[in-house]
Amino acid sequence: MAVIGALPKEVAEAVSASRLLVVGAGGIGCELLKNLVLTGFTNLDVIDLDTIDVSNLNRQFLFQKKHVGRSKAQVAKESVLQFCPDASITAYHDSIMNPDYNVEFFKQFTMAMNALDNNAARNHVNRMCLAAGIPLIESGTAGYLGQVSVIKKGVTECYECQPKPTQKTFPGCTIRNTPSEPIHCIVWAKYLFNQLFGEEDADQEVAPDIADPEAAWDPTKAAERANASNVDGDIKRVSTKQWAKSTGYDPIKLFNKLFRDDIKYLLTMDRLWRKRKPPIPLEWASLHNKENCSEIQNESSLLGLKDQKVLNVASYAQLFSKSVETLREQLREKGDGAELVWDKDDVPAMDFVTAAANLRMHIFSMNMKSKFDVKSMAGNIIPAIATTNAVISGLIVLEGLKILSGNTEQCRTVFLNKQPNPRKKLLVPCSLDPPNPSCYVCAIKPEVTVKLNVHKVTVQMLQDKILKEKFAMVAPDVQIEDGKGTILISSEAGETDANNHRKISEFGIRNSSQLQADDFLQDYTLMMNILHSDEMEKDVDFEVVGDVPEKGPQKPPEESVKNITNGSDDGAQPSTSKAQDQDDVLIVDSDEESPSSSNADVGMESASLKRKLPDEEAVSSTKRKRIEPPVEEDDDIIALD
């Protein structure tokens, strides 16, 4: 190997003797595997849950058209062995969050290198490397931007030392009643897809929100309208899916309900339109009269790239009808009770969302978007740049060589910019920060305070929204610190399922209660202090108090770096990654890697999930004996739906 021959003898020996774990075999992963074997690393393990898609072939050079549909990790191994047959590579087509890959598994490796595309997996690998005591090199790209950083237990910040920007969400009443931006209509259209063809979610309702406080002159009327009963003369409410089924998914009836009747109903909430331009209902018949029919555009007749053309309203109405018919047939083929899953690469599903979103944009007087733009926003996409991946993968190897040579103090967080900074540098290195003493992951005794309403939060919400989603646990076990060792949540299948729909107050949890949450897979324990509040904001289930930890003085970066947000164009640009970070939605390639960790000087965030990860199986470990929860007083508990 030419490269290893140029290294100092001690470093070359360390390279030959090391065993590396590469997590991810996508854009960065392909480049990284090539760089590693050409540098002299021959003992590698690579893991990736994904399979090869046609859209990967323009930049993930280890894959060819004949490989589409196969495991990325396995094909990457085969391709690398063709030009480096002496390498020993083990490939895993699996999720790194599988309990099989426990702390002992991670301890086999000299170091781990992340080439991931989602925050949940990054959090998990961060914790596993901390537990195993091995260095981790984190990386990410987003378009022309990139970042590499080193994480070492007790020496540097971990991936979670600095809080990541929270997911961008929109109030339900904005989505349902008063959209003001194209993204609001696109989110509504995705919700509509699930309400009609997929898994129904009460939080994704698309019908006008009659409980919108802004729509009522008297604030008390909002609650009254929301709770109106059939006796009061209200029409009996049925779900959107039930209604659609009753019509046989008739495209014209669906169109008139969604874009005419619901809009007319919104207009009756006249207070909403005092300072807004009112929506204009659409009528199927008027769009398809003789005059408008002549204006319907045939996509095949459009010049240029058809997905980048904006059609007229009549054409989007026609596209809506055709996509509904296609999706209806897909449901019928799957049988009774079947559900469809929205995928940006599924043509009928993408056509449906494009048509529905644009029709709603037109109704609310917004400029309509091309299918390409809708797909970018709905699928959280930033075009991936192969050169960026190549540069970042090279930097990963350089940082790895510093670690193997024993010069961890020389490691840097390096940002790749879109344009040179004032010092004409594209690559900007910054000193690594020490561990954050307030970090709820790598602190000696991780502890956090969570503000919530104990009479509204259920055990299921505690497990899914707080422990798994917010604190990135995989298989949490929760014990109430009540002197009895009451087990509230167990990762053993079925052991505490009966608790799921009960409010946590029913277990004696109140203000100042303490919960100990353990994830035995991650070798991670978090002490949670409960701060009860009866006055949580609307649509806010909980709040982490002091989520932004105080940091001590920082070392000045070796090069100044401007703080960047999506869409800025002020020179240096190291950052973007979460599709939720700004009002016009920061778009990230859901198929690609994105900048991974935040920094005081540079806003680098993590990418969106590529897919819903499978539920992990229960973790085998020694568990405390479950003690039945107290069934005592339900003192003044108010059960709220």
Swiss-Prot record:
EC number in record: 2.3.2.-
Broad enzyme group: transferase
Keyword annotations: ATP-binding, Metal-binding, Nucleotide-binding, Nucleus, Transferase, Ubl conjugation pathway, Zinc
Keyword Lipoprotein part of the UniProt annotation: no
Biological pathway: Protein modification; protein sumoylation
Subcellular location: Nucleus
Residues binding ATP, per UniProt: 24-29, 48, 56-59, 72, 95-96, 117-122
Family: Belongs to the ubiquitin-activating E1 family.
Record protein name field: SUMO-activating enzyme subunit 2-B
Organism: Xenopus laevis (African clawed frog)
Gene behind this protein: uba2-b
